[in-house]
Regions:
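N-terminal glycine-rich anion-binding loops that anchor highly charged ligand groups
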Residues: 3, 7-29, 57-62
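A generic local secondary-structure boundary/capping motif
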Residues: 6-8, 16-19, 55-57, 89, ...
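Acidic-glycine-rich active-site phosphate/pyrophosphate-binding loop
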Residues: 17-28, 170-176, 241-252
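Glycine-rich anion-binding loops of enzyme active sites
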Residues: 21-38, 43, 62-158, 299-302
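Small-aliphatic-rich amphipathic alpha-helix that forms the alpha element of a beta-alpha
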Residues: 41-67, 83-94, 172-184, 191-202, ...
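Glycine-/charge-enriched secondary-structure boundary and capping motifs
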Residues: 75-98, 105-110, 182, 192-315
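Active-site glycine-rich loop that binds ribose-phosphate moieties when present
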Residues: 115-124, 160-180, 254-255
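A structural signal for small-residue-enriched, beta-sheet-centric alpha/beta enzyme cores
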Residues: 137, 143-144, 188-193, 203
C-alpha cells in the first residue's frame, strides 16, 4: 500500500511505519508481541515492552504512547496477567510514555506486547536502507539471548548467566537512540528475531551495499559460547542460519558455532548503527557517556561488485 504521506512502509523491511501529518510532524507506528521467554511474569512484561519500544528507538524517533496487546488463557490465574502488565507499565514509565489502553483475547498461551506510537520530524527518521560504502557498523548490546533463554527453558543454564541476559533484554534502547540522534547516522535497525546477520542483510539489501563483519569484535553475552559448545541452539536461530547461508561468505576460520551465534534470534537486542567513519569516534563516545551496554565497531560497509556476497564474515 502506498500513500503520499506514508514516508516509510513495508518496502524496505524497516522497523516501523512513518506517516507524515504535517511539515514538521510525523507519527511512527509499530506493534510487537510474543509468548513468555522467561518464567517470571513481571520480568516477561518488562522484556516484551522493551522489545516493542525498540522499533521506535531504531527509527530515531520518540515514543509517546502505547496500547497493550494481550493473549491469555482463561484457566490461568489473573494475577499472572496483572504482573505481566505491571512489568510492561514499569518500562513505559522508564521510557516516559503512557499506556492508554489495549486489547485482549483468550489464547492457549500467554502473549504480550505493545502497539507503540512515536513522533519524529518528517525526513529525520533513521531508516535501515541508507547505509553508505565506507560506513562503520556499531552494535549497542551483546548477542546471545536466544541461546541463553533456550538453555533456561531446558534448565541447563547457570542462574547468573540467565540473570545477566534478562537484564540485557529488559534494558531500553532509549539512551542508545538519543546518542545516535545527537551524532547523526546513516542507517539503523534493532537486532531481534532475525539475528545480527539477518537484520544486517536487510540493511545491506535495502541500501544496495555489502558488509564485512569481524566475528572477534562482536560482543557476546558471557556464557553463550559455553552453551553453544553443549549443543544448545534455538530452532529459530537454525532457521536464520539456513536462510542466510546463500548470502554470506564465511571465512575459513569461522566455526559452525560462530555461524550459529551470529544468526542467533535475539529478543530486545541492541541497535545496529551504520555511521560515517568520520563520525564513528563521536558516536562511540556518545554511546559510552549514555551508558549503553556496548559501543563496539563490529564491521564495515562496502560497495559490492556483481559476484560479491551481501555479507562477508571473517575472524
Amino acid at each position: 500500500m502506498t500513500h503520499p504521506n506514508l514516508l516509510v512502509g513495508t518496502k524496505t523491511s524497516d522497523d516501523a511505519a512513518v506517516y507524515k501529518l504535517s511539515d514538521d510532524l510525523a507519527v511512527v507506528l509499530t506493534i510487537d508481541f510474543f509468548p513468555p521467554i522467561v518464567d517470571d511474569p513481571f520480568t516477561f512484561g518488562q522484556i516484551a515492552a522493551a522489545n516493542s519500544l525498540s522499533d521506535v528507538y531504531a527509527m530515531g524517533a520518540k515514543p509517546i504512547a502505547a496500547l497493550n496487546i494481550v493473549g491469555f488463557p482463561s484457566d490461568l490465574d489473573m494475577s499472572i496477567l496483572g504482573e505481566i502488565l505491571k512489568g510492561g507499565a514499569s518500562k513505559a514509565l522508564e521510557a516516559g510514555i503512557i499506556i492508554a489502553g489495549g486489547h485482549s483475547v483468550v489464547d492457549a498461551e500467554p502473549k504480550y506486547g505493545l502497539s507503540v506510537t512515536g513522533i519524529v520530524n518528517p525526513g529525520s527518521q533513521t531508516v535501515n536502507s541508507n547505509s553508505k560504502p565506507g560506513d562503520l557498523l556499531v552494535l549497542t548490546k551483546p548477542i546471545g539471548t536466544g541461546v541463553i533463554t533456550t538453555a533456561g527453558k531446558q534448565e541447563k543454564v547457570d542462574v547468573d548467566v540467565l540473570k545477566n541476559a534478562v537484564e540485557i533484554m529488559a534494558t531500553l534502547n532509549k539512551t542508545a537512540s538519543e546518542a545516535m540522534i545527537s551524532v547523526g547516522v546513516n542507517a539503523c535497525s534493532d537486532v531481534t528475531g532475525f539475528g545480527l546477520l539477518g537484520h544486517l542483510r536487510e540493511m545491506m539489501e535495502g541500501s544496495g551495499t555489502g558488509a564485512r563483519i569481524y566475528k572477534s569484535k562482536v560482543p557476546v553475552i558471557e556464557g553463550t559460547e559455553d552453551l553453544l559448545n553443549q549443543g544448545i541452539a534455538p530452532g529459530g536461530t537454525m532457521r536464520n542460519l539456513e536462510s542466510l547461508n546463500p548470502t554470506v561468505l564465511w571465512g575459513k576460520e569461522i566455526l559452525e558455532n560462530d555461524k550459529i551465534l551470529l544468526c542467533d534470534a535475539q529478543t530486545s537486542g541492541g541497535l545496529l548503527i551504520s555511521v560515517d567513519p568520520n563520525k564513528a569516534d563521536e558516536l562511540q563516545k556518545s554511546l559510552s557517556e549514555a551508558g549503553t551496554l556496548s559501543n563496539q565497531i563490529v564491521g564495515e560497509v562496502y560497495s559490492p561488485s556483481e559476484n560479491d556476497p551481501t555479507i562477508h564474515v571473517i575472524g
